């Protein structure tokens, strides 16, 4: 099993961000190990876990990073964001303050992460319906306004946890594979090859190659 896990076509680093106590560690453990710990304390030390999924016949290995409790001190370092191609920005649907802080997290993410990082807004603890403090429509509207995807999850009862991670990984894969097609077509100048030409503006060519390399070589 371990050997199979080492075989993959793409490796994507995805970070979990958001206030302390919103359930980031349990989202991570639910997706990667199908575990949930009611007694879970704030994460201490750097923690990441991996899991591979299949998309279009390709093996995508996700390396998912948890904030290691640094968010309590507002001390997440730029190293945490380095190389990340995806981010799950998590709040607790039963605590409005964690949702209010989403804007600050989004700003920090955009200040430190790659410009093209794929971001998903995640309203966690959807099992606490009777305590809901953040209306779904309000969060969805915020996500649309800021070009984020959006989903509500429950790490406790597993609702939408698989979907959240698979959706963001699939979106990242689509972007990366499109760039590969664009790059190959733009650089293929050999006559007689039966390749559909996809025009890529010369000014962005170099940038595209660099970003792709970043994604592949994490």
UniProtKB/Swiss-Prot annotation:
Keywords: Acetylation, Cytoplasmic vesicle, Endosome, GTP-binding, Hydrolase, Lipoprotein, Magnesium, Membrane, Metal-binding, Methylation, Nucleotide-binding, Prenylation, Protein transport, Synapse, Transport. Residues 183-218 are annotated as: Disordered. GO terms for cellular component: phagocytic vesicle; phagocytic vesicle membrane; recycling endosome membrane; synaptic vesicle; synaptic vesicle membrane. Disulfide bonds: none annotated. It is found in: Recycling endosome membrane; Cytoplasmic vesicle, Secretory vesicle, Synaptic vesicle membrane; Cytoplasmic vesicle, Phagosome membrane; Cytoplasmic vesicle. Residues 216-218 form a propeptide. It catalyses: GTP + H2O = GDP + phosphate + H(+). InterPro entries: P-loop_NTPase (IPR027417), Rab_GTPases_membrane_traffic (IPR050209), Small_GTP-bd (IPR005225), Small_GTPase (IPR001806). GO terms for molecular function: GDP binding; GTP binding; GTPase activity. GO terms for biological process: cellular response to acidic pH; constitutive secretory pathway; endocytic recycling; insulin secretion involved in cellular response to glucose stimulus; melanosome transport; receptor recycling; regulated exocytosis; regulation of endocytic recycling. A lipid is attached at residues 214-215 (S-geranylgeranyl cysteine). It is a lipid-anchor. Residues 201-218 have a biased composition (Polar residues). A motif (Switch 1) lies at residues 36-47. The small GTPases Rab are key regulators of intracellular membrane trafficking, from the formation of transport vesicles to their fusion with membranes. Rabs cycle between an inactive GDP-bound form and an active GTP-bound form that is able to recruit to membranes different set of downstream effectors directly responsible for vesicle formation, movement, tethering and fusion. NCBIfam families: small_GTP (TIGR00231). Switch 1, switch 2 and the interswitch regions are characteristic of Rab GTPases and mediate the interactions with Rab downstream effectors. The switch regions undergo conformational changes upon nucleotide binding which drives interaction with specific sets of effector proteins, with most effectors only binding to GTP-bound Rab. PANTHER family: DRAB11-RELATED. Belongs to the small GTPase superfamily. Rab family. This is Ras-related protein Rab-11B.
